[in-house]
Every structure is written in C-alpha cells, then in structure tokens.
UniProtKB/Swiss-Prot annotation:
The protein's name in its UniProt record: UDP-N-acetylglucosamine--N-acetylmuramyl-(pentapeptide) pyrophosphoryl-undecaprenol N-acetylglucosamine transferase
One family name in Pfam for this protein: Glyco_transf_28
Compartment(s): Cell inner membrane
NCBIfam families reported in the protein's UniProt record: murG
Natural source organism: Francisella tularensis subsp. novicida (strain U112)
Example GO BP: cell division
Domain of life: Bacteria
C-alpha cells in the first residue's frame, strides 16, 4: 500500500530515548511518500533536534509524576485544555494516523486523536511501560513494544493484549549496518572501552573511569577509552584525566555525533541502560557493562538490561555496586581471554528484534488499509 498523500503525525519528546526511534520511523514514512508532521513541546530537546529534519508543531504539555499537590490538582484541567488544542491541531493537519513514542506530549495528542476516531499507534521503548503509555493503551489501535514486558497480562486487559505487537526499538541505519559485521577480538594489548553516560552524562561513571584506568595500569591491563561525558561534566572529567597518558585516551567529548563509528571502534562499553543504548548495543553486537540510572522511573533501566544480561551478552551493576573492584572483576577475565568478548558479541546479536522500523511501517499500512 502506498502512503502517498497520507498525513501522519509523530509525537515524541523529552529525551533522546523517545526522539531518536521516532526520527527513524519518521524518515521511513517519508521514504514511503507520507506527509510527516512532528508534534512536540517548545523549549525541549525535540525543539532543537527535529526542525532540521521535519516540520514540527508545538503544544505545551507537562507531566504529573513527583510534582507538588497544586500541580497534581490542576493537571486534569491542563490535560483537558491541551487535548482540546491537540484536537484542533489534528483537524487542521487533516491527520490520517498518529504515532506516539512517549514523553508527556504524546498524552494529549494521542487522546485527542482517539476522541475524533483517528487511529493511534503507541510505541513503548522501555521494558517497563511508562505512565503515559499505560493510559494511552486503552485508546490505541496498536500497541508496539520494544521488549518483552514482565507480567504484561496483569497490566493489560485481554483486549489490550490482543492489539500488542513486539517490534523492538527502531535504530538508525548506520548502526543497523553494524549487525552484519562480525566482531573480531584479537589478543591486542589494548582493551578499547567506550564510556557513555546517556545524553545528560553520568557523574558517577565519569568520576570512576579515570580511576579505573590507573588501577588497571597497575595490574597490567592496558585500557584505552572513548569517553562521552555529557555537556555538564566535560571540563570536570577532563581535569580528572590530566595525569593519564594520552595513550589511554581516544577522545573525551560532551557528545559523540557518530555513534556507529564509536560502537565499531570499541571492544566493550560501560554505559547507562536507556532503551535506545541497550538496543544499539544488541544490534552492534557490543558487549556491555550496564549501570542503570538509579532515579529512572519504575527502575526501567535495570529491566531494559536484563534480556542482554540473561543471555550472557553483558553485565549489570547497580550504581552502588560500581566499585573499582567489581569493574576489574569483570574486565580482567575479558582482557585475558578475548574469545569471551567474541562470544558475548554473538549472543548480544541474538537478543535483538530485527527490522523494527519495517514492522512498525507494516502496522501503519495495515491500519490505513482498513480505515
């Protein structure tokens, strides 16, 4: 089925974990000749990223979690107001279908679509269903999941389960291309570690890595790092590396623009367990030490990592467990026997769900074909 002249609304915002999978789908829809419009919130991450690629419209929207009593009381009124505004926007755009990728902005847009009988697809990137998507699941035409959800039958009705599809997380093409490339782990004297703290950086990870390099050196383990610090921690982290030889440093940067090159360079990654990072590690076949963000809602980062960990393709340390001793206990055996890394790489690739973007595209076509 052709999507030519179909008006499809993408709504996602707040974090890269919501935005980048949505961008992958938006691009695929455009390649299939759909008219794609993004709806986000002003003064947000999507407001700075999306306009380079797609037309974007804005509505104001905010969440209610962990907010004061006044905001909780006024939230229903704001939601109703934003839903009415969203309804007007969808009519103006002559929307044929809405796809929600999470973030607070998805709530009013998807609710408004359901109220005026516009089909809605929601996509949950994490292994725990977020509050917005739990609410929207009642109204969605199709519910797409990135991970197997523990006890899903206790969270969804039989009707909701019937419209649920496991599709994985859409990932950028340059990273998908790494899946076809076998990782060869030689007995090189250098262990190349990519360090990622997520888009906001991770202070605890940034602080321990320079110490890890020094301690590893004492034990005869030659580590070289490519370290993404996040914008707020760049200078502080660079200072911590001052007495470390440049032979141990590939680069220290606030952000890494070319993640495919970074994943391809590394033997191992130390990172948070955001949904997109976990999915990219699986696709790239990159063994990982995951340090879930302690403050993540519903501890979702811990659960994101479990599929890879349970398949012996990675490790997971709680932040309080992220000591030099525990990190070295993982790294030392991998450095001594590189075949373990090679086996982990193969197992990581087995955990992924392939063709995620194409599966979501198929959902779009089926819904519009039956409309």
């Amino acid at each position: 089925m052709s999507l030519e002249n179909k008006n499809i609304i993408i709504t996602a915002g707040g974090t890269g974990g919501h935005i980048y999978p949505a961008l992958a789908i938006a691009e695929l829809l455009r390649q299939n000749k759909a008219n794609v419009t993004w709806v986000g919130t002003p003064n947000s991450m999507e407001a700075s990223i999306v306009p380079e690629y797609f037309n974007i419209q804005f509505i104001k929207s905010s969440g209610v979690r962990r907010k004061g009593i006044i905001k909780k009381i006024t939230f229903p009124l704001k939601l109703a107001y934003n839903t009415l505004r969203s309804r007007s926007l969808l009519k103006k755009l002559k929307a044929d279908l809405v796809i929600g990728f999470g973030g607070y902005v998805s709530g009013p847009i998807c609710l408004a679509a359901a109220l005026i009988n516009i089909p809605v697809i929601i996509h949950e990137q994490n292994a725990k269903i977020g509050l917005t998507n739990r609410i929207l699941a009642k109204f969605a035409t199709t519910i797409c999941l990135a991970f197997e959800i523990e006890n899903l039958h206790k969270q969804f009705s039989s009707k909701q389960l019937a419209k649920t599809k496991l599709v994985g997380n859409p990932v950028r093409k340059d990273i998908v291309a790494l899946n076809d490339k076998a990782r060869i782990y030689t007995d090189s004297s250098t262990l190349k570690i990519l360090v990622l703290g997520g888009s906001q950086g991770a202070k605890a990870i940034n602080e321990i890595i320079p110490k890890l390099i020094r301690k590893s050196n004492e034990q005869g383990i030659n580590i070289k790092v490519w370290h993404q610090t996040g914008k707020l921690s760049l200078e502080e982290t660079k200072d911590a590396y001052k007495d470390i030889s440049q032979n141990h440093i590939k680069d220290i940067a606030a952000f890494i623009d070319d993640m495919a090159t970074a994943y391809n360079w590394a033997d191992l990654v130390i990172c948070r367990a955001g949904a997109l990072t976990v999915s990219e590690c699986a696709i790239a076949g990159l063994p990982a030490i995951f340090i879930p963000l302690p403050s993540a809602v519903d501890d979702h980062q811990f659960f994101n990592a479990q599929n890879i960990v349970n398949n012996n393709a990675g490790f997971c340390l709680r932040q309080q467990q992220m000591t030099l001793e525990n990190l070295l206990a993982i790294i030392k055996p991998l450095n001594q026997d590189r075949s373990k890394l090679e086996q982990m790489s193969k197992m990581a690739k087995k955990t992924l769900i392939k063709n995620s973007s194409e599966q979501i595209l198929d959902c779009v076509k089926k819904i519009l074909n039956n409309k």
